[in-house]
Amino acid sequence: MKRRQFIASLASATAATALAKTKAVASPLIGIQVAGHSLLDEGMERCLDTIQATCHANAIFLYSHSYYAAHGRAPELYADHGVPIRDERRRKITRVWLRHHPEAFKNTSLAMPEPTDEYGDRDLFAETVEACKKRGLKFYARILEPDTSKLTGRVANFEQGMSVGLDGKISAQPCRNNPQWMAWWDAIVSDTMKSYPLDGFQWGAERMGPLSSVLWKGAIPFCFCEHCETRAKREGINAARARQGFGELHAFITKLHAGVAAPSDGVFTNVMRLLMKFPEVIAWDYQWRVALEEQGQRVFKLVKAERQSAHVGRHFDHQNTSWDAIFLAQWSYADVAPFADFIKPILYHDILAPRLANQLAELKRGPLAELSLPQSLELFYSLRGYDSKLQPKLDELNVRGMDPEYVGIETRRIVDVVQGRCSVVPGIGVDVPNTALEAPNGGKRPSDQLALRAAIKNAFTAGAGGILISREYDEMRLESLKTIGETLKELGQV
């Protein structure tokens, strides 16, 4: 996008959303994330009865496409809602929950298949529109950007829209500079809004950039396709030096992961030395983020073009909101606000603790090798402004959750940054399981009810415009749903 086009789109989008943003702040959004199979397994009316009678949600957030979602969980990780629990691992459930118009995808070779798996014969979006309308519930579509593993065998020609690694092979992420991907993604958004009278559309991309991916995981750097190189040239970035810098950084991290002795002058020093020697690496990584935000700007404009009153939500996952310092530094929430009616940061206090343990272990193998794990944890708490006396110690990360102060601090941080330009609707984690290998208690992590109450209260005290009850309804115990409803009533939010 050229600079003058960007400025023009920014101005028009800001003007177009002033009214919508006022509404978003005035009326608390109490949403709940539901998977399509939950509505059908439990029965639409029964499921909505349960939701309204317990947590008092006023909005249903349903996947339009569940390519990237919580799939393949053991039955023990589902909550008992009074109906038989089916083993999802033995099922082949559709990943498309609505009906598309083929002509919407005329500008891309990525083919949207007809739903043929279990429940593929149901237009669940049409059914949910009617069910929500009768009950006075708002209905929002939600979608997470899929990756290579989720598209394989499901979307024909998807390879033509994916990133290309330094090794010349297809990478996990899509390339947001690739016209094929852009046309496919834009068609999904536009056709979804055109086809159904939705109250809103929430999208997210649970991604790390190329630099974070190398430093955290030792992943092969990306994207070096022709479209990214064209963009780099336009921005004055030397692609050859970016390739060289990423290559040397990847080789260094790979050796560390293989157990090669660290250099005598230190791992962190050598990482910084490479970044200073090759500033093109940081520039290349930044353009990855700019392209991601341009995708968000297109989503906003496409949704508003079809339905001006619809709310556009931006989902940021745990790595985006909490531990990926590079992602957080690249782009301020203030820069996101003009293209969102609300921002939904994942602030799942319970499950963050074991996830954080995994991230610290990965950093220990790479750029933070000189720090002990307790030192890294203390550094994280200090950088994010958390009280280490309240938060779990290293040996507690896998057995208890974060103190709910986490929810309040991160909500307030975003509220202060966006300054009323959009609403902040944090995702409150409810009974989210730990799906890591060898997780304690088989992965079950039932929410502490007092902590759940505190998390909700902290969110609203910090200025939240609502909450999004997360991660998935099928994981939420009735006890937790009732606790949420009672807390919201106590706060006067329902």
List each model region and its residues.
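N-terminal export signals
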Residues: 5-24
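Active-site-adjacent "subsite" loops/lids of carbohydrate-active enzymes
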Residues: 111-114, 140-196
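Aromatic-lined carbohydrate-binding/catalytic grooves of carbohydrate-active enzymes
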Residues: 57-117
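Substrate-binding cleft of secreted/luminal carbohydrate-active enzymes
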Residues: 340-354, 400-413, 420-486
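Catalytic domains of carbohydrate-active enzymes, especially glycoside hydrolases
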Residues: 46-69, 195, 462-466
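Aromatic-lined carbohydrate-recognition surfaces of secreted/lumenal glycan-active proteins
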Residues: 140-144, 148, 202, 245-250, ...
